[in-house]
Amino acid sequence: MGGVEEFPFPFEPYPIQSDFMRNLYACLEQGNLGIFESPTGTGKTLSIICGALKWLLDNKEKQKNELLKSKADLELQIKEIKKKHEGDWFSAQTEQMTLNMEIVSLQQKFDALLKREEKIKNYKQKVKQYNEGKIENKKRDVNKWKTKRENETENSRLDEKVENIDDFMDTDLILQELDKHSNDSEDDDDNESNEQECKIYFCSRTHSQLSQFIGELKKSPYNDKVSLVPIASRNNYCINSKVKALKNMNLINDLCQQLQRKSKTTSKDEKTIKKSKTKTTSCPYMPGNQEILIAEILTEIRDIEDIVKTSEELKTCPYYSTRKSIEDGQVILVPYNSILHKNTRESLGIDIKNNVLIIDEAHNLLEAIERMHSVSITGKHILQSLNQLTQYQEKFKSVLTAKNVLHLSQLSFCLKKLIKLLGGTSKSLPNDKPKNADNKLFGLDEFEISAEIDTINIFDLIEFITKSKLAHKLRGYAEKYGNENIVAEPCKEKKGVSEFLKSLQKKDSPEIKENIKQHEDEIDKDQITSPLFVITSFLETLKTKCSDGRIFVVPGTVIGDGYLRFLLLNPASHFSDIVKEARAIVLAGGTMEPMSEFKDQLFLSAGAKPERIMTFSCDHIVPKENILTCILQSGPTGVEFEFNYQNRQNTKLLDELGRTLVNLCNIIPAGIVVFLPSYSYEELLIKHLETNGILAKIGLKKTIFREPKSSTQVNLVLENFSDSIKKAVKPKTGAILFSVVGGKLSEGLNFSDDLGRCVIVVGMPYPNIKSLELQEKMKYLKENVNSNAGSIFYENSCMKAVNQCIGRAVRHINDYSTVVLLDRRYANKQKALPGWIQRTCSVQPKFSGAVQALARFFAAKKKQTSNQ
């Protein structure tokens, strides 16, 4: 495939790795949309690096050779024309003119490619000179900077509180007359439209996963052959302690941009500032020694921490330096939102056109896009924003232009209409009771009509809010003047979501409680300091194509707890631009089945041609005899396992589950990880097992751990879990960890070797079928994909979650583990399991059969280990 058989690799690759790289190379060469599955532990990241970077460098040489060949062909044609029209000067010149123009164009493209190579050489020379101390003013500049910083530190030592960091002047707060053609970009750099060589954008969910990629790249043969640029947020890159102290992302972005504006003031502006009683400063790290930092980034592979450390030494901003490095970078590392969110992508200067996009850990890509573009706003958000807006208009009414007054009035009108949907008025307080408000579901066009905002041009209003930086100015106003007549805090009780969801099902429903918690957690994350940020995001959803989303109106028991939620139903609508512009796209993951989801709901729905889509799936590197999978249909006393909604609180079933765990703990060595369907069910089970004494019996063999509720406690629990296994003293043989499907431990964590000798999945974690959001999603798929798409989505939601849990074990070729699926329904779902699990999967109608199979498996492994 692609005519390539050999790939540079740090060691002899496994056959499946070579196969992966060949298929990846072909995908990029042919400009395809690839879905690649390689089980975790098979060296997927290294295969991606070596396959993709070989293609990247080959393509660069191919591009240059094709330009030279095309130029040579044209020059040959010109010679032939001269011979053909010898003596006829006019005819020869006429034909040659077009060809000469083509030659000039080809030469310009070739020169542009050479120019980048020359720039990298110059960067290397600059880094060398800098490191050797040959830049004349280096010490003087650093000493000058230190003196300046010491003076600033001394002056500000008495005023270090976060709330006093940002010194806003009234001139900063007043809305200016907007130029319709003004450029809203943060950067003033002139981007050359030269021929650019192809870049690879590598995208993953978290910065830790991107750091892992960098670690693998450093071990690869391409460590010194490519320029890599890791992109991150200001939160990760900012080295200005005053800005970082703000913690909140919106506030950090706001203050950073304000400091940039102050550093770009004209002489006229400076005279005005000097007359002001309020002090103003620009960021001391801008522009700084950016050229050297850019050179450092582009000439050596560095992760985020390395770049931050170097930038602190150079006293220059790493955030803006990495952004400026994108132009000459070959491999650009970006988190999900920087690529998948169009506004973020454009603000960073990321251009996907004719470039390659590789998205790793893409198994939840559809859900990630939906979450990224789904927005909730609370009654408290609306009331506080309305309150800030009213105060702001009153404060500056004498200096606001007529246009600005009009737009502010339109925004105020919208906010009043939105709070009306939640049973409030502009004079309401968050803890007031709502009046005449009901739970409702709307299409986008219906919502605007029902909310009575259909007469407002939402596009113009959002453009005004964005270009005028109104949210920043309201935040600045609140910081300086405080919220006079500030809205009262809502009641602590959060019943807005619960009342809505409980009306759908019994009040004691564990699934409903999980759904309530999910919505409450989402809303709690919204920052109240400047609520217009999230309200603007909500208003932007109204620009979505009507059929692609729904809006839920959910009044609370108090107005502040009610919420409006936009749910994106069609993630392809935010991926279509990428599909159209990118040269090739690769979605990679450990468990990508069912691949039909990505084909139907992402690529085809985004307008891709079917023939452009390719798939690749490889087996696990772990030998067949190192994996055992049992579908357990009943327990020790014959009670059938079916953990559906009706049976989940069945005490006989809970007792049987407890007896099963006791028996399995007796025969399985080291670590066991148990995945349960939900947090509420985990609590129910643990309480029941404590009450009937079964938990104590489990504790005789295994030290018991539970998934922590706080993410900050995860590492501590895992460390203790690991220590308990390593230091187990008889009669104990290890530890057992109770976890939750889709929780903090079901993705991204490894339970290799003794940490995960058995993964047990209890029940089938179907999403709550009573959820209105789920119902709307299924209905949308049925109407827009095919008649079975909704029910298939429901089934896939369950099995994808199960497969993620299974993938936590068996992380390298010499590892071994077992998987026990506790529910009789799994017998009919075997084809939805990963291929490497299917090959050893057996259905065990009776408990004794499973016990014997597990006992034989571990006896064989014990014997094998003792013989080594």
What would you call each of these model-derived segments?
Residues 2-11, 56-331, 337-340, 387, ...:
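A substrate-engagement module of RecA-like helicase motors
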Residues 11-28:
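N-terminal pre-P-loop "Q-motif" helix
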Residues 30-48, 168, 174, 199:
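Walker A/P-loop
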Residues 305-329, 340-349, 468-636, 714-745:
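A contiguous, basic/glycine-rich beta-loop/short-helix subdomain that forms a polymer-engagement track
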Residues 352-383:
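SF2 helicase catalytic motif II
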Residues 576-577, 638-677:
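Conserved interdomain hinge at the start of the Helicase C-terminal
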Residues 633-652, 705-827:
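Conserved RecA-like P-loop NTPase helicase motor core
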Residues 677-708:
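Conserved helicase motor "Helicase C" RecA-like lobe of SF1/SF2 P-loop NTPases
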